[in-house]
C-alpha cells in the first residue's frame, strides 16, 4: 500500500490529531450528503423494475462483492432473471456503457465486475452513471431484478431496497466524513437502510456474514484443492492482497493453518508479473479479486482462494423479498 494512503487510513481508524484541521471540510461533506439524501427522500423515484442496492458508507472495501454474488445466485435459484450494474472502479475504459462478460479484461473493466460476471454468468453493465446502466440493463436484458454493486450514494439511481455492508474489524473509524474520516455519509445513514450486514465479526444491529473458503484454485490450470490438501502440500506461502482490508485475507489464511508472508498492495492494484516475482519458489496465494487481474500472466505456483458468503438462514430471501415488494 502506498505510504500516503496507509498514513491517511491509519489516521482514520487509529486516530491522529493532524486530521482535526480537516474538520470544516468534513462538515461540508456531511452537510451535502444530508442535503442530497433529503432531496432523494422527497422525490423517491420508483424504479422500472425492482432494484437492490448493495453498498457501504465508508471508503474502501467491506466485502460487498461476495454478497452481490450470493444474492445473484439466490435470485437465480428462484427462477429470476438478474442483471448487475456497477461503476467498475479503477478500470481503464472510458467508454460507457460497457457489457462485462466472463472473458472481459479486468484491467479495462475493473476487477469486481469481471469477478461477478465470471462467478455468476449474469449480465453486468458498467457505467459511472448508474441510472444509465440501469436503463441499458433493462432494455438489453429484460431482468426481473437488478442488483447494484455499490451505488448507495448515487441517488439518481432509483431503488427498491438498500443493503449496507460494514467491516466490523475496522468499523467506522473516527466516525467523521471525508476527508477527516472514512465516511461517505454520516453514520446515521445506517438507520435508514433496509439491512446492515457485518463482515469480520459482530456489529450492533447488523446481520453477520462469514466468508467461507470453497477451496484453493490454481490460476494456471484451474485445478482445485481442498484447504487441508493445500496445507499439506504447501504449509508456507506468499500471501498477496490488493483489497480494501488486506488483514481480512491474511487472517483467513492463518485460520486455515498456513504460514504466510504478507504482501499488501493498493485496492484495485493493476498487477505486473514483477510484483509477484518472489525468489524463493514458494507458492503465491491471493484473493479471487486479485486473481482476475493476474490470470493473463499466471504462473503454475500461483493460487487463489474463492470465498462464499454465508449468512443467517433465510436472510438472502428476506433481502430479495424486500426488493421485490413481497414483504
UniProtKB/Swiss-Prot annotation:
Q: Which SUPFAM superfamilies is this protein grouped with?
A: P-loop containing nucleoside triphosphate hydrolases
A single BP term in Gene Ontology:
lipid A biosynthetic process
Kind of enzyme, top EC level?
Answer: transferase
Q: Has keyword Transmembrane?
A: no
Any one cellular component term from GO for this entry? plasma membrane
- For this protein, the Enzyme Commission number is 2.7.1.130
Keyword entries, A-Z: ATP-binding, Kinase, Lipid A biosynthesis, Lipid biosynthesis, Lipid metabolism, Nucleotide-binding, Transferase
Q: In which pathway does it act?
A: Glycolipid biosynthesis; lipid IV(A) biosynthesis; lipid IV(A) from (3R)-3-hydroxytetradecanoyl-[acyl-carrier-protein] and UDP-N-acetyl-alpha-D-glucosamine: step 6/6
The family database entries (InterPro entries) matched by this protein are listed as: LpxK, P-loop_NTPase
Catalysis performed (reactions): a lipid A disaccharide + ATP = a lipid IVA + ADP + H(+)
GO molecular function term, any single one:
ATP binding
Which of this chain's residues are annotated to bind ATP?
A: 58-65
* PANTHER family in the record: TETRAACYLDISACCHARIDE 4'-KINASE, TETRAACYLDISACCHARIDE 4'-KINASE, MITOCHONDRIAL-RELATED
**Task performed by this protein:** Transfers the gamma-phosphate of ATP to the 4'-position of a tetraacyldisaccharide 1-phosphate intermediate (termed DS-1-P) to form tetraacyldisaccharide 1,4'-bis-phosphate (lipid IVA).
Q: Which family does it belong to?
A: Belongs to the LpxK family.
Q: Known NCBIfam families for this protein?
A: lpxK
Q: What is this protein called?
A: Tetraacyldisaccharide 4'-kinase
Q: Which organism is it from?
A: Alcanivorax borkumensis (strain ATCC 700651 / DSM 11573 / NCIMB 13689 / SK2)
